[in-house]
Amino acid sequence: GNTIVDPCCGTGSFLEEVILNDPNDGAYNLCGFEILPTPYMLSNYRLSIVSRQHGAGAHTENIMLANTLCNGMFGEAVDESTIEGAEIARASTWAEMPLKLIVGNPPCSDSMRQNIDSEFSFINGLMDDFRPPRTVRRARQNIQKQINNPFMQFIRWSCEKLLRAQNNSVLSLVVPLSFLEAESYRYARKYLMEHFSNIWVVPIDADARTGIRSNSLFHTLQGRAVIILTRKFGEDPGFSEYQFVDFSKGSIAEKENYLNQDINQVIGQFRTYNIDASTLAFYPSKPFDEDKYNLFWPISDDNDHNAIFMNHCSGIKLAPTALFTH
């Protein structure tokens, strides 16, 4: 059957929902990888309760205690005589199967560099695909800061596994709302555009740090969105438009109602937008006076055009400099 993976399954809530939303009792392999022992145990317990309440079903369940991003998950030899090594080897076997669907809510943190030592050399090598071209890279470049954010690494890991599969496949992940349009993620969006066939975008929570009141489903100040990408095997990949519906402005009850609708009702609410070649954003731009905007100089420019500052240095925005950088 098909193989479905949550590469950062936590306590198993996404895996539980896959089972509960499968009325036809499909014969698929359901796999979850989790690095922390406590969530790993809770996810196993959670799925055992689901099986007890709803029957074992035709699917198989495998929750493994493994670091999804380590080299062992890409086929590097591990010491299987240890519990950790045996779990990684087992997880790697499942991850190398033809995957149909990857779902999850990957961890997100830009406050520290993670997974950067030699044990993670494979995923770090793959992250080059999310960087700017070498010709425009510079030291201390802010747009490269997010490369070591775990959620970015999980996106790239998921892409690598799905693109190897010789079948149609789907990637559905929760991402920070800023991923949809921030310049820091421009080249990650470009990679997705070039390697998948279609995308659906659903903002769920607004970014509360901007001062906008938001009734958030996710317990974080940072906004959240869901991206759903499909890949048609055997066809040339690539898309230049996206399907978009915004649920971020409703109350929690309204959001839950939206998300629990029949899929045919939800699909009808999406609108199609062309992707702006200058930003590669997955978020519609708000209307503005373009002629007036073009009268002004940018803060800086990399193409020797008129700009307020000829040189710039990345740094922390403090109160005295907020006037120039906000």
Residue ranges and their predicted role:
Residues 1-201:
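SAM-dependent methyltransferase catalytic region
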Residues 97, 114-116, 141, 160-326:
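Sequence-level detector for compositionally biased, low-complexity segments
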